[in-house]
Design a protein with these regions (language model features):
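Acidic, contiguous segments within the catalytic cores of piggyBac-derived transposases
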Residues: 1-581
Length: 581
């Protein structure tokens, strides 16, 4: 339960027992949250992904830069580079994304006929040698005419200059495609990568210790990444700064050398006018939160709530102010005389719009926020005097509830992106950015698709796998008509629409026979859906239940190599079907 109590915390500067509505920031909803485009014109998965996020100009940029690099550096020694086409680039990324669903020991096994890992959809898309050629020459930034000394100078200013344009391009796409809800959060994500690079971070407490750090502003309700940029390491410029041909930063240098590291990234992510003065609630963790960050965000009309480290707030960064705030509160600690009892809380007002709250749960929780807090109750697991587990009710500040609700957007978005991260191994660090952010665009399109169609959590279409798999297969078979008068870069979808999964046992002859008797090259592959409930096999003479599906027909069909079960073959065989009529 989470009921608000009538009595307020003893916070300086406000009346006792004031209602919550008087102090919670009221969100000024100037525009509707969610996707910004007209749903009636663009609401299908294909249109959302390729019309909003992965647009044609992105693929053209990849093709032009990769061809420029390949012509200069991938020719010679008896090898001739053949220009990469628009179709090949999309098919290449389709194979890369497909390897997020299927992991193999060595990717060449996908092309080896007779190998258990052989995958027709990949083998028919392009040859293994052509895939390796594109992988070897893949580039976003064309720096073939940039002298090596200028490249080294650029790397000293920003070590990620080769991919910053790509990251900024997709960040602008996401920014233009989504309006935030009333709550947002700023947190750090990561791109797993083990390489020799100055921007690579190491944190042994993370699931993947070595990674590139990404700072992101996410919607807390729908987990959509509104804005993001990559961290290039200490002393590097932030993305968006102007760097001339000599590698010099043209932006005016900040004279204040005492600016916190987190301050720069929060300032950069919130520098859009559409986020200002709408009482947006921003959640920050203790690495970002601080007095200077809160004052900067309040000057932009953004409310803040977050945890913080207690030894930061006491220190003053100005000679005019005292070293410590007067009547500074005593924080709860894990042990000693200041250890609290579960449910104890204190709140204190440091400035006009700067409050701190200390609450003791199993351990002390210290919050810094820009609006007053009140008192609520929350249920927690506890033990009674006999040692039995019970549900106990404790008091809790409302800012803790707000913080828990708001600080989850970036973490959930990172979790979505990690589900089907590609298994393509490469020694080149820019490729990690390319593959990671293309995967993230699939997640963004999936979030928009769920929002437009109002899909609930357990709806069968509200699955990232079910949303992404047909799109990836379409990319692997992508073709364009060069004989027509239309733009050769306009995609032509030759993939037959996927039929919905059958509910229960149905006769085989009621299925879509035009799709059913297509050759196997059209995508009639058997896959195992471990998360789906077992359904009755659609073969006429079989009554077993199975989790195996046909990728094109979408119907359950059992297949067992040990017992020589032929339901999958019989269902797709026109001759066998005719014998049964």
């Amino acid at each position: 339960s989470d009921g608000v109590q009538s009595s307020a915390l003893p916070t300086r500067g406000r009346p006792e027992g004031a209602p919550v509505a008087d102090f919670m920031p009221e969100y000024d909803k100037k525009v509707k949250s969610g996707p910004t485009w007209d749903f009636a014109e663009n609401h299908e998965p294909m249109g959302i992904l390729f019309g909003i996020f992965l647009t044609d100009d992105m693929w053209v940029k990849f093709v032009d830069s990769s061809n420029a690099y390949g012509r200069k550096f991938d020719s010679g020694n008896g090898r001739t580079f053949v220009d990469i086409t628009f179709q090949e680039m999309i098919r290449f990324f389709g194979i890369v994304m497909f390897l997020g669903f299927k992991s193999v020991p060595q990717r060449r096994e996908l092309w080896e006929v007779g190998n258990s890992m052989y995958t027709p959809i990949i083998a028919e898309s392009m040859s293994c040698r052509r895939f390796e050629t594109i992988l070897r020459n893949l580039h976003w930034e064309d720096y073939t005419e940039v002298p090596p000394d200028v490249q080294r100078a650029r790397s000293k200013v920003n070590s990620l200059w080769k991919v910053n344009g790509f990251v900024e391009y997709l960040s602008n796409k996401c920014d233009a495609a989504w309006n935030l809800h009333s709550m947002a959060d700023i947190d750090e994500g990561g791109i797993p990568c083990k390489c020799f690079h100055s921007a690579q971070q190491y944190n042994n407490s993370k699931p993947v210790p070595r990674f590139f750090k990404i700072f992101s502003l996410n919607d807390s309700k729908y987990y959509f990444p509104k804005r993001f940029h990559a961290y290039a390491g200490k002393g590097s410029t932030t993305p968006g700064d102007n760097i001339d041909d000599d590698g010099d930063d043209n932006e005016e240098e900040n004279d204040d050398d005492d600016v916190p590291a987190a301050y720069i990234h929060v300032e950069k992510l919130t520098d859009r006018l559409d986020l200002w003065f709408i009482n947006l609630l921003m959640a920050l963790d203790n690495w970002f939160n601080g007095t200077r960050v809160i004052k900067m965000l309040r000057a932009r009309g953004i409310h803040v709530v977050g945890t913080f480290i207690t030894n930061r707030v006491a220190l003053s960064r100005s000679e005019e102010e005292p070293a410590y705030y007067p009547d500074f509160p005593v924080w709860y600690t894990k042990s000693g005389p200041t250890k609290g009892v579960r449910g104890d809380m204190r709140s204190f007002q440091l400035d006009e719009e700067l409050y701190v709250t200390s609450w003791f749960d199993k351990k002390p929780v210290n919050m810094m926020h820009s609006y007053p807090t009140c008192k609520t109750t929350v249920e927690r697991n506890a033990k009674d005097d006999d040692g039995k587990h019970i549900k106990a009710t404790f008091e809790r500040p409302t800012v803790v509830r707000d913080y828990v609700k708001a600080l989850r957007g970036t973490d959930v978005d990172d979790q979505y992106t990690s589900y089907y991260r590609t298994s393509v191994a490469t020694k080149r660090w820019p490729h990690k950015f390319y593959f990671h952010f293309v995967t993230k665009m699939f997640v963004c399109a999936f979030i928009c698709h769920k929002y437009i169609h109002r899909l609930q959590k357990h709806h069968k279409e509200a699955s990232l796998y079910g949303f992404s798999k047909p799109l990836v297969e379409y990319m692997c078979r992508f073709v364009y008509d060069t004989d027509s008068d239309s733009d050769p870069e306009d995609p032509v979808d030759t993939r037959t629409s996927v039929a919905p999964l059958a509910k229960g046992h149905k006769d085989a002859k009621v299925s879509n026979n035009d799709m059913r008797f297509q050759p196997k090259s059209e995508g009639h592959d058997c896959y195992h859906d471990a998360k789906a409930a077992p359904l009755m096999c659609r073969s006429r003479n079989c009554s077993k239940r199975t989790r195996n599906r046909c990728a094109a027909c979408g119907v359950p069909l059992c297949i067992d190599l040990r017992n020589n079960t032929t339901c999958f073959y019989e269902y797709h065989s026109r001759g066998h079907y005719a014998e049964l009529q």
